[in-house]
Amino acid sequence: LYHSLGVMAFERGRTSEAREHFRQGVRTEAGRNSAAIWQSWAILEGQAGDEEQARKLFQKGLMVAPKSKYIWLAWGTWEAKLGYVDRAKELLAKGCKLNPLDPYLLQALARLEAEQGDLEAARKYFDQGTVLDPTHQANWNAWAMAEWRAGEIDRARNLFQRGVWVNPKHINAANLFHAWGVLESREGNISLARQLFKCAVNVNKSSERIWLTWAMMEENQGDDIRAIEIRNMCSQR
């Protein structure tokens, strides 16, 4: 109860109220033994700018649930956002060691390595993640994007394609089709990009971002009428 109340207050921007709910929650036996409430409280303090308190709360959560993949992931990604890259890598690596079958921790570590320019290390972790869960389309997408940013266009194409074929009709495939379409449009392969954007909206018609990206490409090609048609389809979806 206290956890739910705290989360609702936090989502409404009532930080002090949320903090008090979390504080009351951990005074109960159930709350003290709940990794989720410690994690939520840690995230609150982190967003409030109290780094020391956030770290203490993450640590208390791990004392309750040492293998909690959610805490290792949340703590590691938070440290990365603050710029404490080495600390983030250490936390994510520990989380991976304790949860060797979790692709999300591997993906987070892979993305961090890619952002730091160590593409070989990133590839190792991305590959491990796809072996663990070949159906995890977000991992294929993240890997493809990392290769694209590094200028490895053919590798990126291959990864987008592999990710799509995991399940072309799953809503997550729309992100792969969309990103792949943007890549092809920037490479000048407009016909292919159109087909990919069409596939993306067929999978996820509610995504305004995909429709507008497609319309913008048509505008850039000088086809204003087609761009208007696509925007109209977006508004009628």
What are these regions (language model features)?
Residues 1-237:
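Alpha-helical solenoid scaffolds in eukaryotic macromolecular assemblies
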